[in-house]
Amino acid sequence: MSIDSLALEQSVQRLFPNQALDQVLAELLLERAKKNLVKYRTLDRQFQAKYGEEFETWRKTVLDSKPPFQTEQDYFDWEMAVTGIADMQEEIKKLQCLQQQP
């Protein structure tokens, strides 16, 4: 299935008047990265509330034990959230730099 390029271009012009396509793409990617950052931070806060400590401290405890299945699953989910936060922060910086270029 292909996208109707003309219809897409018209939508871009209506929603982002006087912006080049690459500027629009950078803006949309920045918006998505910020949404992802909020999602990962929310997960991180939920796990901090559940376990009463930050990931790195809790991680050492888990790795030194034989955790039950749910704790192990939380480990992977929390690790994904912490990694996602770092990745999204880096991506946001890159995209903001791109937007500042003339």
Language-model region placement:
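Short E/K-rich amphipathic alpha-helical oligomerization segments
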Residues: 46-69
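Amphipathic alpha-helical coiled-coil segments
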Residues: 26, 30-40, 44-47, 81-88, ...
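Hydrophobic alpha-helical segments, principally membrane-spanning helices and signal/leader peptides
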Residues: 7, 21, 37-39, 59-62
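Short linear motifs at secondary-structure transitions and domain/linker junctions
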Residues: 14, 21-23, 34, 45, ...
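Amphipathic alpha-helical coiled-coil segments with heptad-repeat character
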Residues: 23, 30, 37, 64, ...
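Short acidic DE-rich linear segments
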Residues: 97-102
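Accessory terminal regions of nucleic-acid processing enzymes
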Residues: 2
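Short, charge-rich amphipathic alpha-helices with coiled-coil/heptad character
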Residues: 5-30
